[in-house]
Amino acid sequence: MPPKPRIALIAHDHKKDDIVAFAARHRAFLSQCELLATGTTGGRLIDEVGLDVTRMLSGPWGGDLQIGAQLAEGRVSAVVFLRDPMTPQPHEPDINALVRACDVHNVPCATNVASAELLLAGLARENGAAQAG
């Protein structure tokens, strides 16, 4: 049996409600995975969805970079990063570095809910789990 997927969950402020709703819909599958998240997102997933999440720093304080470092070490299976394309982010270079690391290391990265749905369905199929959702 393959190892548990280790999934990073990240969301910009205007997308936090979306990632909480997404995680709630997929709670059964996500609870079978190892999860890590940036600080505020992780706190909401713990408090509102009841998931076990390893929290990094908040994104603007280096959380995206912490996740990127683990990804570069081969310790992240997939990234769900719900980005807000309409709001400038003060830590945009960190965000670009994380997405680039996904590309360099061939780690799937979903940046909107539609692609995140497909990503989880693929992980569930690959890991023989019940369909995500």
Swiss-Prot record:
Q: Give a GO cellular-component term.
A: cytosol
UniProt entry keywords in alphabetical sequence? Lyase
MGS-like domain mapped to chain residues = 1-133
Its top-level enzyme class, in one word, is lyase
By its UniProt entry, which InterPro entries does this protein fall under?
A: Methylgl_synth, Methylglyoxal_synth_AS, MGS-like_dom, MGS-like_dom_sf
Q: What GO molecular function annotation could you give as one example from this UniProt entry?
A: methylglyoxal synthase activity
Q: Which cysteines are joined by disulfide bonds?
A: none
Catalyzes what? dihydroxyacetone phosphate = methylglyoxal + phosphate
Q: Which residues form the active site?
A: D64 (proton donor/acceptor)
Q: Return the EC number.
A: 4.2.3.3
- The reply to whether Metal-binding figures as a keyword in the UniProt entry is no
> What GO biological process term is on the record, naming one?
methylglyoxal biosynthetic process
Identify the domain of life: Bacteria
- Write out the residues that bind substrate: H12, K16, T38, G39, T40, T41, S58, G59, H91
Q: Which family does it belong to?
A: Belongs to the methylglyoxal synthase family.
Question: According to its UniProt entry, what is the function of this protein?
Answer: Catalyzes the formation of methylglyoxal from dihydroxyacetone phosphate.
The protein's name: Methylglyoxal synthase
- Gene encoding it? mgsA
